[in-house]
Amino acid sequence: MALETKPAKDPAAEDKHELDPKRKAALDTALAQVEKSFGKGSAMRLGDQPEQNVEVIPTGSLALDMALGIGGLPKGRIVEIYGPESSGKTTLALHVVANAQKKGGVAAYIDAEHALDPAYARKLGVDTDSLIVSQPDNGEQALEIADMLIRSGALDVIVIDSVAALVPKAEIEGEMGDSHVGLQARLMSQALRKMTGALAQAGTTAIFINQLREKIGVFFGNPETTTGGKALKFYASVRLDIRRIQTLKNGDEAVGNRTRVKVVKNKMAPPFKSAEFDMLYGEGISREGSVIDMAQQVGVVKKSGSWFTYEGDQLGQGREKVRQFLKDNPAITEEIENKVKAEFGLIGSADQFAEDGEAAAAAAVSEAAAADVAKDSKAAAAPAAKTTRAKAGTAKA
């Protein structure tokens, strides 16, 4: 006897069940009371609110922006960056600060480690004159200052460097050998409960830099853990694990690191994606190197042997020469970057950017030609004017 299989019902095709009129009236009354008490938009049907794209701050690495799935770090959310010592945690955070400032945003830096180097920050593009910096005495003071700045509603990004340095006041005032179990974890839990809503309302991105510790007595699984308890793991919308994987050398001299960032947690897009990019000493993240890697990956830039080509034109021989060429030609870099973003569906189509790029190039050529014509006309007019003045002088004499 053959079994009959019924076709699966499509939930989208089924009619929506109408709510009972009495229950609907009661719900509408409740929503009206909530709106009256707490303001418009405090509670609403999700369908009543138009879908909005998440605002982001670029990280400085195109590869990492693509791995995050939305083009950067989300605004109004908590982000945790953790990894071993000298892996590039602070450098990545400073690049985010610099990108926020370039868009006209305001940034703050809570330097709990008292180790911020203004000269290095300037090299990464940070406007140190407008950067708000605080070097607090203890953890409570650091988080209270951060909360007050967030609630001002004027910040775009705030960096707390680092969670491990947020020492509770009781621990500072106590003796060196005293035991203070769970003090920092409770402090973080309380602070994050207060901050989360304020961050969303103000549209401020909070970046917590964290350090790694090892659990004692772990024989199976990963013994590494982060400081500050578990609260940050729950409240963070994005968690980034950053590691050095290779030393970049120019001959025998080390010039930087090849860095891998794994998106361990992501509430905005699928997690567990990885990104690799160059981090150069004194320069930070190599934007051009990341653009080359991603453009090659999606086929916007092609490589044949050691030569790199873009739309049939040779960019150069060898990755380092191409990187320098793109650094000297930011317009081409931006054009390639936009095409890569279009391939990932983050902005308009690649064809549109190609047309825009060609139009911009044509406009640039036209402007240059017009400038040359004007220059030639001016040069030709000068001798004529000189001759006229000479004739006038002779006639006068």
Curated annotation (Swiss-Prot):
Q: Which domain of life is it from?
A: Bacteria
Q: Which keywords describe this protein according to UniProt?
A: ATP-binding, Cytoplasm, DNA damage, DNA recombination, DNA repair, DNA-binding, Nucleotide-binding, SOS response
What's this chain's function? Can catalyze the hydrolysis of ATP in the presence of single-stranded DNA, the ATP-dependent uptake of single-stranded DNA by duplex DNA, and the ATP-dependent hybridization of homologous single-stranded DNAs. It interacts with LexA causing its activation and leading to its autocatalytic cleavage.
Keyword DNA-binding belongs to the record? yes
The positions annotated for binding ATP are 83-90
Per the record's keyword annotation, is DNA damage included, yes or no?
A: yes
A cellular component annotation (GO) from this entry:
cytosol
BP GO annotations: DNA recombination; DNA repair; SOS response
Protein name listed in UniProt: Protein RecA
Which residue intervals make up region (Disordered)? 1-23
Q: Which family does it belong to?
A: Belongs to the RecA family.
Q: Where in the cell is it found?
A: Cytoplasm
Gene name for this UniProt entry: recA
PROSITE patterns to which the protein is assigned, alphabetical: RECA_1, RECA_2, RECA_3
Principal place of residence: cytoplasm
MF terms per GO, please?
A: ATP binding; ATP hydrolysis activity; ATP-dependent DNA damage sensor activity; damaged DNA binding; single-stranded DNA binding
Organism per entry: Bifidobacterium longum (strain NCC 2705)
InterPro entries referenced in this protein's UniProt entry, alphabetically: AAA+_ATPase, DNA_recomb/repair_RecA, DNA_recomb/repair_RecA_CS, P-loop_NTPase, RecA-like_C, RecA-like_N, RecA_ATP-bd, RecA_C_sf
